[in-house]
Amino acid sequence: MSFIVEKINCNSLPLKRKTRFAAGHDVYTPYDVVFEVGQTEAKVYTNLVVKSVPEGCAIIVAGRSGLMHGNGMRAIDDEITVGSEDELIITLTRKTGLDKRVVLKSETRVAQIIADTTQDVKLVELPISTYGLDVNHGDVPVYKFNTHWRLEAMPWLRDYQGNRNEVYLRLKSEHFNGIIDPDYKGDIIYMSETPFERLDELYVEVRQFSGETYLGGESPDNVVRGEGGFGSTGGH
């Protein structure tokens, strides 16, 4: 999965492993990053980086040892360019002990940022109806893919065919588990830069314009539902 970096420091690109950024840089993550009391390190694994780095923290760019390419194991290059197919990990290191909980709030415009920085990919629609599955509300269908495709967050995706949901994708291990909300009427649009070269898990996050959020990777009790939404509970 490409780790797209924006608004860190243009002069620092291409990023090198172990590159450090001081506290205060304006960077993004598609989900909240939490420092618990006493915690000195936090990692961010997905498309963008970290917003509002706390005073006294440093950001370290590192490579991931197990990438979803071929057999799943590949060392990353010494230099990482924006748009490369390497997933980077941003490590937030707290230089001193914490005396309070710190939450780095996520950036919600991930789709638009990806659209601005991604090239040579295409949009793929995956409506539920194409799977041929007999799925009832509350069931946990397993969607598996073994095809090679990429897709991009197109600039017009936010209004695509009247669908008011924004869907983000993260790549995990071997399958995607989802619970279908019976009120959902639109297509589920998966967005990724990663070629699916083997059975991989789709980890989906859906945000509605009205503000409701559906998060993959949470238990059904933690899924927030809203009218016309799709709740997913991706397995780990």
UniProtKB/Swiss-Prot annotation:
Matching SUPFAM superfamilies: dUTPase-like (SSF51283)
One of the Pfam families matching this protein, by short name: dUTPase
Biased composition (Gly residues): 226-236
Residue numbers spanned by region Disordered: 217-236
The protein, known as: Uncharacterized protein ORF75
Annotated source species: Ostreid herpesvirus 1 (isolate France)
